[in-house]
Amino acid sequence: MIIGAVEAGGTKFVDGVGNEKGEIFER
């Protein structure tokens, strides 16, 4: 799930697949 970094309260990291787009994922 693609989420907003600010809205994310859990662990945030940039996924390798969305690295070039800078998509933030929560796990």
Curated annotation (Swiss-Prot):
Known EC number: 2.7.1.4
EC supergroup of this enzyme: transferase
Cofactor: Mg(2+)
Activity control summary: Inhibition by zinc ions.
Any one GO biological process: carbohydrate catabolic process
Cofactor note (record): Divalent metal cations. Maximum activity was observed with Mg(2+).
Reactions that this protein is recorded to catalyse: D-fructose + ATP = D-fructose 6-phosphate + ADP + H(+)
Keywords: ATP-binding, Carbohydrate metabolism, Kinase, Magnesium, Metal-binding, Nucleotide-binding, Transferase, Zinc
Induction section of the entry: Induced by sucrose.
pH dependence, record text: Optimum pH is 6.5-7.5.
Metal-binding recorded as keyword: yes
Family stated for the protein in its record: Belongs to the ROK (NagC/XylR) family.
Subunit structure: Homodimer.
Name of the protein: Fructokinase
Name of the gene this protein is made from: scrK
